[in-house]
């Protein structure tokens, strides 16, 4: 946008300088163009605006001249050309973005394809190993076939020798005949088995690589899935067991800490009341600060944060006390020791709370001083704002809330500390009243100055209109 505006300014300047300076009409036109340039430069320099001269304001009041110059110099066409250039640039940017997206998609696809190629290479590397194993299994099968053929040949030779030997016997015994028949049948069966074995071997050999390939590919995915499921189940079971153990331990701790629940509740209520005090203190301070131009957020946030921290610490101490052993379970000596420890802890807690309250009041004093200083600076920098705030404060009567509003909500458990705080607040209010008087005087003077400035502004407007 700035570049387009700069181009428009350059074009206007070139056209202004190109105008002829012969007649008084052209001189007026040049003045108007210069004023237009000043206005455009003022609009472009927004962080540090440059004021427009009153002469230019007077010249620009004539609308007819401005319109005639705009029509004469064809600025509308130039603006349209600039708009077209911007549209073209946007279209080019969109095209570039689309091209970048397409390139990213192509890169992702290439990555996926490279990953698939790597997987295929891994499987191919595994398959030659299986083939080598199949070849090794085929080699011993061939050796066994040759051994069987040799044994068959030996059996056949022995059978021929036995058949040639007993021929002179005319009438063999029945036992010998039966043995001969058995021997004659056994070689036939062996030959049948031998003939069947080579035919069955190829099928076995074909089956071996199939099983090996299946055994190599199958476990890679199935076993991993099974292992993952088993691990998830084991983790879930372990988590359930841990939760049950924690519940049992908590139940045991609660049963043991039964007698100590009363003091912990008392301590929690005590600190809860303290936390309420802090919140009310912060609310009162925020009201007083709203009258002077501040909402009191700077005090409320740290005080609330401290109260929450203290409350969380006290809850942790109470849980530790609940986790400890009860008083009634131990004999007399141990019970007394526990009581002493409890008393010491209570004393330490009270001491810490007092220290924290002292720190808090000191912090409040520092914040009050800082706020007064900031208010004075703001009054000097921005008189209008200080005047508005002073009028609002007087109209609604938030100036002096009084000590009773701050004392009414305090509990009766710590009357001494409440009275001390009330006196301290009264002193602070007295000191603040002196400061407020000085501030009131300053505000009155500022209001008078503001009224005078308004009168001057009205007069200037009347002069311009006249």
From Swiss-Prot:
The modification Pyrrolidone carboxylic acid is found at residue 441. Residues 1-18 form the signal peptide. The modification Phosphoserine is found at residues 114, 215, 288, 312, 353, 386, 413, 417, 433, 447. The modification Glycine amide is found at residue 332. Pfam families: Granin. It is found in: Cytoplasmic vesicle, Secretory vesicle; Cytoplasmic vesicle, Secretory vesicle, Neuronal dense core vesicle; Secreted. The keyword Phosphoprotein applies. Residues 92-111 have a biased composition (Low complexity). The lineage of its organism: Eukaryota, Metazoa, Chordata, Craniata, Vertebrata. Residues 233-247 have a biased composition (Acidic residues). Belongs to the chromogranin/secretogranin protein family. This is Chromogranin-A. Expressed in the brain and adrenal and pituitary glands. O-glycosylated; contains chondroitin sulfate (CS). CS attachment is pH-dependent, being observed at mildly acidic conditions of pH 5 but not at neutral pH, and promotes self-assembly in vitro. Catestatin inhibits catecholamine release from chromaffin cells and noradrenergic neurons by acting as a non-competitive nicotinic cholinergic antagonist. Can induce mast cell migration, degranulation and production of cytokines and chemokines. Serpinin regulates granule biogenesis in endocrine cells by up-regulating the transcription of protease nexin 1 (SERPINE2) via a cAMP-PKA-SP1 pathway. This leads to inhibition of granule protein degradation in the Golgi complex which in turn promotes granule formation. Serpinin and pGlu-serpinin can enhance both myocardial contractility (inotropy) and relaxation (lusitropy) and this cardio-stimulation requires a beta 1-adrenergic receptor/adenylate cyclase/cAMP/PKA pathway. Self-interacts; self-assembly is promoted in vitro by chondroitin sulfate attachment which occurs at mildly acidic pH conditions. Interacts with SCG3; this interaction is optimal in conditions mimicking the lumenal milieu of the trans-Golgi network, i.e. pH 5.5 and 10 mM Ca(+2). Interacts with ITPR1 in the secretory granules. Keywords: Amidation, Calcium, Cleavage on pair of basic residues, Cytoplasmic vesicle, Disulfide bond, Glycoprotein, Oxidation, Phosphoprotein, Proteoglycan, Pyrrolidone carboxylic acid, Secreted, Signal. Residues 91-443 are annotated as: Disordered. One of its GO terms (cellular component) is chromaffin granule. Glycans are attached at residue 433. Residues 177-213 have a biased composition (Polar residues). The modification Methionine sulfoxide is found at residue 387. Disulfide bonds join 35-56. Residues 131-155, 248-259, 305-314, 351-378, 412-440 have a biased composition (Basic and acidic residues). The gene is Chga. Binds calcium with a low-affinity. GO terms for biological process: defense response to bacterium; defense response to Gram-negative bacterium; defense response to Gram-positive bacterium; mast cell activation; mast cell chemotaxis; mast cell degranulation; negative regulation of catecholamine secretion; negative regulation of insulin secretion.
């Amino acid at each position: 946008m700035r570049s387009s505006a700069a181009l428009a300014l350059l074009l206007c300047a070139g056209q202004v300088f190109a105008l002829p300076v012969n007649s008084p009409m052209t001189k007026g036109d040049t003045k108007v163009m210069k004023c237009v340039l000043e206005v455009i430069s003022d609009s472009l320099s927004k962080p540090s605006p440059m004021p427009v001269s009153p002469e230019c304001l007077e010249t620009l009041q004539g609308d007819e001249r401005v319109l005639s110059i705009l029509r004469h110099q064809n600025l509308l066409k130039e603006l349209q050309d600039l708009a077209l250039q911007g549209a073209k640039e946007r279209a080019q940017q969109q095209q570039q973005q689309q091209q970048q997206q397409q390139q990213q998609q192509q890169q992702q696809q290439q990555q996926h394809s490279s990953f698939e190629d790597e997987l295929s290479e891994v499987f191919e590397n595994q398959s030659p190993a299986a083939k080598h194993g199949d070849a090794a299994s085929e080699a011993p099968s061939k050796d066994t076939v040759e051994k069987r053929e040799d044994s068959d040949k030996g059996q056949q030779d022995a059978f021929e020798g036995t058949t040639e030997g007993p021929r002179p016997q005319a009438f063999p015994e029945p036992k010998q005949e039966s043995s001969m028949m058995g021997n004659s049948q056994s070689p036939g069966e062996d030959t049948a088995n031998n003939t069947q074995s080579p035919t069955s071997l190829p099928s076995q050999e074909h089956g071996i690589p199939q099983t090996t390939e299946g055994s190599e590919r199958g476990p890679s995915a199935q076993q991993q899935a099974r292992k993952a499921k088993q691990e998830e189940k084991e983790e879930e079971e372990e988590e359930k067991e841990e939760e049950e153990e924690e519940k049992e331990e908590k139940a045991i701790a609660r049963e043991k800490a039964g007698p100590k629940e009363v003091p912990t509740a008392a301590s929690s209520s005590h600190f809860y009341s303290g936390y309420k005090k802090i919140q009310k203190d912060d609310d009162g301070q925020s009201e007083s600060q709203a009258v002077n131009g501040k909402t009191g957020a700077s005090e409320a946030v740290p005080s609330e944060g401290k109260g929450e921290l203290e409350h969380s610490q006290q809850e942790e101490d109470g849980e530790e006390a609940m986790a400890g052993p009860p008083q009634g379970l131990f004999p007399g000596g141990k019970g007394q020791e526990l009581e002493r420890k409890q008393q010491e802890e209570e004393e330490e807690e009270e001491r810490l709370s007092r220290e924290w309250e002292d720190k808090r009041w000191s912090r409040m004093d520092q914040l009050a001083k800082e706020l007064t200083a900031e208010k004075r600076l703001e009054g000097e920098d921005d008189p209008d704002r200080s005047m508005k705030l002073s009028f609002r404060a007087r109209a609604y009567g938030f100036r002096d809330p009084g000590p009773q509003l701050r004392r009414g909500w305090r509990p009766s458990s710590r009357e001494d500390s409440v009275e001390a705080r009330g006196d301290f607040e009264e002193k602070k209010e007295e000191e603040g009243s002196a400061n407020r008087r000085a501030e009131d005087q300053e505000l009155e003077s500022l209001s008078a100055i503001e009224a005078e400035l308004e009168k001057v502004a009205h007069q200037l407007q009347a002069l311009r209109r006249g």
